[in-house]
Amino acid sequence: MTSEILTRPDLGDVIVGVDGSPSARTAALWAAVEADRRGRSLWLVHAADTDRRAYWTDAETIQAVREAARDLLVGTATAVHERFPDLVVTRRLLRQEPVAGLQEAAGDRGTIVVGSRGLGGFSALMLGSVGLGVAARAEVPVIVVRGGDERPETGSVTAAVHDAADLDWLLLAAAEAEARKAALRIVSVWNVLAHVGSVASMLDDLDGIARQRVHEVKALADRVREVHPGLIVGHHVETGTSTPGILIEASGRTDLLVMGRGRRPLGVGPSLGRVAHALIHHSRCPVEVIPSAFVTEAGQS
């Protein structure tokens, strides 16, 4: 753990993908709550993919697509303003395909929000296609809205950490918790098979390795408390053989599950690992994925 001076990261504007599906509408209203909580603007984005469609679609159809998209954005903005009349809401109709459009709208400081299911077809925000593409490739935080509207708040944000390198994005999770006036729970899963594999039986000090993990997680919690002295921060190391299973279970006891996204192998291709992949499909609460390339002020000395 380094001794750099840490500062609180700022939470940026909220950018939500709108495609007309019930899931996207739920995500838009969730994003409005998030933007209001942050004191930031909300951007409603529909990426109509008209540049690509124009290769095989006539101009009249393209115009109809644009008009339908404008109506969709206006209707969504109206629904948001009914609940948050003072929230600054901007509508954007983009010509790109959804993954590129959402990334462009987010810039380098925004947070992208998507629903957990889409309509299918060109404009869908379906996990497995667009939603997964955004979560895997975006260089800004991405929140996949999961869980039911009727679910009561727990007053906690959970961060799933691995090691000391997670500090930068962990401070963003702390900022999320503070904005919600919630506690931050730092959880690390100690899976001996995943960490030392088939040589586990040959190691004499597995308990010592586990204690080292506990020490690292405690050190992370201490650094967070330095930056957020008023924040309630708990930390826990869970032992088990299924990291996704443990975190999915934990998602039922928290309002937001936050995790980092590793660097891409050789610098190319998507980098969404199996744990994140499982969580955004099966979590019982919204999941926030923060890429390692997202440099917060907290990571600068």
Name these PLM-found stretches.
Residues 130-149:
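Short, structured interface segments
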Residues 12, 29-32, 44, 50-52, ...:
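N-terminal membrane-targeting/anchoring modules of bacterial envelope and secretion proteins
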Residues 1-10, 23, 60-63, 79-112, ...:
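Structural beta-alpha unit
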Residues 2-59, 155-204, 225-228, 232-233, ...:
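Small/aliphatic-rich secondary-structure junction motif
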Residues 43-45, 90-94, 143, 185-187, ...:
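General small-molecule cofactor/ligand-binding pocket signal
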Residues 114-133, 154, 242, 256-282, ...:
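Glycine-rich, Arg-bearing micro-motifs that act as flexible, cationic patches
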Residues 113-116, 142-147, 287-291:
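Short beta-strand elements of ligand-binding domains
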Residues 25, 33-36, 42-44, 66-73, ...:
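Conserved N-terminal glycine/acidic-rich loop preference
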